[in-house]
């Protein structure tokens, strides 16, 4: 999102591609996964992690993250059949509601989560992975915090958050972080999070 929609260099290449997919039930998820594999472009990475696929030619990893009808009341999902692996789905509905269409260099258009939604998902992932994959999420979150102002622009900030410019010691990065926090709060006030 930062690079293709806003021209912000992320300084590192992502290690995988995550696709959030709203599904009615596990049968729909299984059918989607099976269709991707049957299409010949993707292969399963392991039977233990059914959400992980790999693009055959590039070996680029693809994670399919279901949400919606597979979620439990606490907005988590437990992977069948044993339900020992649990994912937190907090932020997935919000990301879908706040998505933007982005055109990639190859001419492909797809809906991508807004930066406030990406930051919300990053915080959720950081919380989930804090004991197992340290140091992976904080640099991404810092990138969003530092560059959000540049991405949304002065007009958005001045129109919706004019008070941020009242400080005598205006700091661009601090204003960017505060602006992102406010826009995340609006996103979390959406009906899906109430």
Which residues does each PLM region occupy?
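Compositionally biased terminal segments of proteins
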Residues: 1-194
